Amino acid sequence: NPWQHKIQYKKTWLEMDTLFKDNSGFEASYHFNINPNLDATAMQSIRAVVERPELWKVFINGNEVSKTEGSFWIEKSFPQFSVGEFLKPGKNTLTIKALRMHILAEVMPVYLLGDFSVVPNDKGFEIAGGNIDTLGSWKENGLPFYSQKVAYSQNFNISGLENMAYKVKLPNWKGTVAEVFVNGQPAGLIAWQPNELDITSSLKEGENEITAKVTGSLKNTFGFFYQNNDNWIFGPHSWNYAPEKAPSGSEYFLMEYGLMEPFELVAVKL
């Protein structure tokens, strides 16, 4: 990777692209397994994300696919490719081919998106059916790489708002921020100690639905995965290490995210 440790002066590195001949291309293949318990609808939903699509031809199980115009993941450098129609239970292969080597043609991760979970196997993870349906770590619920939001809802019956204050408290959660909604309306954020939010003004007499949406981060999406996460700073050097053989997904270093215990509604008499 010439971009990790080099400094571009004018066009010094970009001009090296002229050194590559027309027949200097290469290909890289990514193999993954799909568990038979993944239903057809979920399999059809799967999309692949390949960076810099202008440099590659993309194939899934030997079938060439094109990016979906206007469909991006995270930002415009991450276009999506609909690949679900060419997938099957068992082993699948996504291949990128460069007809000519290019100075920007780095072999980077390819991402798979869709309505599925993953389970550890001997080498990494296997795509499977299922979704989060309980409290606890996203890692243990089949979404170890998920970075977005999971909503947790509870109903509370309120009798007597006068001279009372009500706070939502998250006693045990892992995430970057939690959004709180009362009866479908935003009530505020929880992001630091004491992990509580006054929602008195959002409540009504009787039944109230309270939802906490916990947000993860891109750390578990982009990695790194093969060494401990305890360092206080991360940089390009953090990706320099990889084991000799692909480890089981159960050995990946991943951060905990999720709501570990039910949130509480604390009533305080004024």
Where are these regions (language model features)?
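Generic detection of short hydrophobic beta-strand segments and adjacent strand-loop junctions
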Residues: F32, P36, F81, E85, ...
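Active-site-adjacent substrate/metal-binding segments within catalytic domains
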Residues: F20, S29-H31, V150-S153, Y166-V168, ...
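Solvent-exposed beta-strand/loop surfaces of large extracellular or lumenal domains
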Residues: P53, V58-Q80, E179-L197
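Short, solvent-exposed secondary-structure boundary motifs
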Residues: R47, F145-S147, L189
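Aromatic-lined ligand-binding clefts that engage carbohydrates, nucleic acids, or primary amines
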Residues: N33-G62, L94, F156-N183, I210-V214
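An acidic-aromatic loop/edge-strand motif
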Residues: N1-G25, R52, K67-E75, F81-N155, ...
